[in-house]
Design a protein with these regions (language model features):
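Short, Lys/Arg-rich N-terminal segment immediately upstream of the first membrane anchor
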Residues: 1-6
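Hydrophobic membrane-insertion alpha-helices, especially the h-region
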Residues: 7-25
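Catalytic glycan-binding domains that act on GlcNAc-containing polysaccharides
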Residues: 20-197
Length: 197
């Protein structure tokens, strides 16, 4: 009986260690929480869910601040220079001085733009993401087309395959980050913060 209890105890310890290892080593690599303070600040400032912002960053740049796409989108949230300068002017910033490779600037402008799209498109996250990817002008045209939107608010059809795929990927990443952030909050509340990043 004592031998069985020792084996079960040993097994339990091994499982706990594996779970801790998996959380502390694997999860931060699969779903990183880089730039957390910046994401928290601007998500809160612009009424966005952190998981939503992380989903966009994950899909846009995989947390590489200096990445430039083939469409010349720059940084963590892949903001084009044109959109960045327009957004900066709308935000009361000097468009001539913005550096879209700077994580703070990029996330600030990206969150502002998501918030602007959110307001423009009635808070429908799929429509907001389509606007972020394909441009708000394209989405406005799609919403006006009865074949693509029955109510002028939601998109029943997204004609660009890239945008359709993008929306699905970001929504999936958002769900994963929602769980990751809940788990992170729970583990940060454990005694001594044993499993916190």
């Amino acid at each position: 009986m004592i031998r069985c209890i020792r084996k079960l105890f040993t097994l339990a310890v091994v499982l706990v260690l594996l779970a801790a290892f998996g959380y502390s080593v694997v999860l931060p690599r699969v779903l990183p929480l880089q730039y957390r303070d910046i994401v928290e600040q601007y998500a809160a400032e612009y009424g966005l869910e952190e998981a939503f912002v992380y989903g966009v960053i994950f899909c846009e740049s995989h947390f590489e601040p200096d990445v430039i796409s083939s469409a010349d989108a720059i940084g963590l949230m892949q903001v084009t220079e044109e959109t960045g300068k327009w957004a900066a002017a709308q935000m009361g910033l000097d468009p001539a001085t913005i550096d879209l490779t700077d994580p703070d600037t990029n996330i600030h402008i990206g969150c502002w733009y998501l918030s602007w799209l959110n307001e423009k498109f009635g808070g429908v996250s799929e429509t907001v993401l389509a606007g972020y990817n394909a441009g708000h002008g394209s989405v406005a045209r799609w919403l006006a087309d009865e074949e693509m939107s029955w109510d002028g608010i939601t998109l029943d059809e997204i004609p660009y395959e890239e945008t359709k795929s993008y929306v699905k990927r970001v929504k999936l990443a958002e769900q994963a980050y929602r769980l990751r952030l809940r788990l992170q909050a729970y583990l940060e509340e454990t005694p001594l913060g044993v499993y916190a990043d």
